[in-house]
């Protein structure tokens, strides 16, 4: 991964948006360009120089709802009340939580629920990107930084957009200042074939159909969300360590193709367990919290959770020992086991690798950190 030679400017100054866009179009550039102004923040995510998503902080969901409304007549699987569902789950449900791009999670959810296809998600992302880039090109003053790692790194990607072609489309709409048009005119693609195919690397090329530069990615594998508000799932937490309810029960009928993912958490600190419970939407996850690692081993065998979070510093039976024991059981050879630790040095990573842990989560963590590791490992 290459770090851009872009200085981090903390103070507002005159900026040239087109020049910043040029700097992130190199084939080895991956990360997020964030540009700050008095009106809001622009976040432009790129992978190998191609734009994969763009958003504006002050209007994150409004454009999404609007473009979904425009697409709904063409998509029979998109329900009329979809905006209300998204608002309840991804706006109200995560209010005041540290998730950088809940709008992108909403798009992933739409694909996972089969409301839209990956190619339709690509069209949606391009329309949003055009709107964001257009407003970004109007910016005259601000500050910026480039972050090599971003929230989208471990999430599904639906398209790779050519930034220059996006700028050209903005010009065609006639809403880009003349100065930007003159500067961009020297970069126009002379060969018509480049409008139809853009190489990303030696193994992949981005071919365009409609829209002309959108490449759908494979269907993402993310947790499915049950939006039936009348459904309640019984969960056992650390405050009730002796009441074991294996699996979950439903108080009303729901569609059989909606799965609730069971997350088994082992930590001697009830506060940590409660934080995990509060971070995870109970319409997606059934959380089981245990403070005793010895009891946890037998209960894991009974509940067969979809993902396991283990504090490595548990007394009696530490996280590494517990993970090693689980891996010896045929059922748990491939179950995601995440080591939760306050330190993630080379020695700790090596120990986790020896016991075949799936990954690690460093304390303290926020909701965004937790969702990233779960979305990365759950199937």
Swiss-Prot record:
**Which terms under GO biological process does the entry name?**
cellular response to nitrogen starvation; heterocyst development; phosphorelay signal transduction system
Free-text function comment from the UniProt entry: Controls heterocyst pattern formation. Required for the differentiation of intercalary heterocysts but not for terminal heterocysts.
- Which cellular component terms (GO) are annotated to the entry? cell septum
Q: Where is this region: Disordered?
A: 181-226
- Compositionally biased region (Polar residues): 186-212
The induction comment states:
By nitrogen starvation. Induction requires HetR. Transcription positively regulated by NtcA.
What gene name is listed for this protein? patA
Q: Localized where?
A: Cell septum
Modified-residue entries (4-aspartylphosphate), positions: 313
Protein name (database record): Protein PatA
Q: Which UniProt keywords apply?
A: Heterocyst, Phosphoprotein, Two-component regulatory system
| Lineage start | Bacteria, Bacillati, Cyanobacteriota, Cyanophyceae, Nostocales
List, alphabetically, the InterPro entries matched. Bact_response_regulator (IPR050595), CheY-like_superfamily (IPR011006), PatA-like_N (IPR025497), Sig_transdc_resp-reg_PatA (IPR024186), Sig_transdc_resp-reg_receiver (IPR001789)
Major subcellular site: other
Sequence ranges assigned to domain Response regulatory in this UniProt record: 262-378
Question: Is Phosphoprotein one of the keywords UniProt gives this record?
Answer: yes
User: Which SUPFAM superfamilies does this chain map to?
Assistant: CheY-like
């Amino acid at each position: 991964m290459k770090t851009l030679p872009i200085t981090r400017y903390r103070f507002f100054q005159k900026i040239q948006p087109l020049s910043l866009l040029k700097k992130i179009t190199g084939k080895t550039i991956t990360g997020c360009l964030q540009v700050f102004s008095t009106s809001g923040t622009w976040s432009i995510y790129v992978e190998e120089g191609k734009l994969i998503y763009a958003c504006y902080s002050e209007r994150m969901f409004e454009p999404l709802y609007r473009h979904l409304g425009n697409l709904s007549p063409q998509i029979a699987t998109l329900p009329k009340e979809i905006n209300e569902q998204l608002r309840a789950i991804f706006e109200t449900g995560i209010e005041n939580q540290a998730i950088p791009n809940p709008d992108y999670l909403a798009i992933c959810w739409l694909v996972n629920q089969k409301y839209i296809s990956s190619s339709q998600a690509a069209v949606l992302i391009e329309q949003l990107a055009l709107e964001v880039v257009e407003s970004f090109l109007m910016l005259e003053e601000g500050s910026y930084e480039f972050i090599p790692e971003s929230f989208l790194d471990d999430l599904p990607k639906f398209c790779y957009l050519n930034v220059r072609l996006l700028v050209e489309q903005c010009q065609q709409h006639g809403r880009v200042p003349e100065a930007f048009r003159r500067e961009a005119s020297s970069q126009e693609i002379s060969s018509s074939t480049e409008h139809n195919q853009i190489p990303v690397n030696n193994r992949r090329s981005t071919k365009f159909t409609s829209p002309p530069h959108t490449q759908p990615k494979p269907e993402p594998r993310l947790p499915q969300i049950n939006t039936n508000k009348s459904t309640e799932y019984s969960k056992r937490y650390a405050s009730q360590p002796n009441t074991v309810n294996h699996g979950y029960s439903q108080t009303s009928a729901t569609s059989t193709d909606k799965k609730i993912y069971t997350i088994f958490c082992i930590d001697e600190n009830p506060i940590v367990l409660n934080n995990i419970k509060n971070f995870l939407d109970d319409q997606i996850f059934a959380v089981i919290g245990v403070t005793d690692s010895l009891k946890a081993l037998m209960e894991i065998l009974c509940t067969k959770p979809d993902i396991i979070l283990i504090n490595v510093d548990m007394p009696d039976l530490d996280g590494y020992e517990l993970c090693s024991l689980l891996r010896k059981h045929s059922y748990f050879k491939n179950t995601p086991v995440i080591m939760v630790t306050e330190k993630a040095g080379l020695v700790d990573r090596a120990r986790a690798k020896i016991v075949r842990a799936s990954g690690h989560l460093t304390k303290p963590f926020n909701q965004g950190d937790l969702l990233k590791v779960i979305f990365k490992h759950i199937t």
